[in-house]
């Protein structure tokens, strides 16, 4: 069940949903607006001929910190990692979905490629996968609204929430845009 503004406020008051820093003015009818942090991860395209998710490629990306009062310029066709300004923490009976803002989508900004789901028990900055599909550069200002967080109540609390040892949660407590850690649990299944 998708939570309404009243339910979101109740979960925040109960401590089962937390955003830090939190601004009550960002609560919408069925979501909470989240803002863009000042850290970005850019791809070092000149260092690799390809990306291999089964291997550790530590220098595939580099962190860029945008100076105060300046934007990050995302050029047409570019893809970068960024993160929410807010640290988001979900209880074991809540899951989240991060969606883009309609106003930004109409300018050609995609907020996430595929990873918009947030598991129950997660706590940390949410990594954003930003793409510019427009024909002009897009100025990204730290602190601007970048997405909206929708919260869903599970039918029962998760038996093993994100962060428990069972799943080897690789991104729990992440600070800033975190590069892929797919290689840490790489596995392929037989094909026919």
UniProtKB/Swiss-Prot annotation:
The record marks 116-117 as: Important for bifunctional activity. The keyword Hydrolase applies. GO terms for biological process: dUMP biosynthetic process; dUTP biosynthetic process; nucleobase-containing small molecule interconversion. Its EC number is 3.5.4.30. GO terms for molecular function: dCTP deaminase (dUMP-forming) activity; dCTP deaminase activity; nucleotide binding. DCTP binds at residues 101-106, 119, 127-129, 148, 162, 174. The keyword Hydrolase applies. It comes from the Bacteria. Transmembrane segments: none annotated. Keywords: Hydrolase, Nucleotide metabolism, Nucleotide-binding. It catalyses: dCTP + 2 H2O = dUMP + NH4(+) + diphosphate. Pathway: Pyrimidine metabolism; dUMP biosynthesis; dUMP from dCTP: step 1/1. The active site is at 129 (proton donor/acceptor). Residues 171-192 are annotated as: Disordered. Homotrimer. Belongs to the dCTP deaminase family. Bifunctional enzyme that catalyzes both the deamination of dCTP to dUTP and the hydrolysis of dUTP to dUMP without releasing the toxic dUTP intermediate. This is dCTP deaminase, dUMP-forming. The gene is dcd.
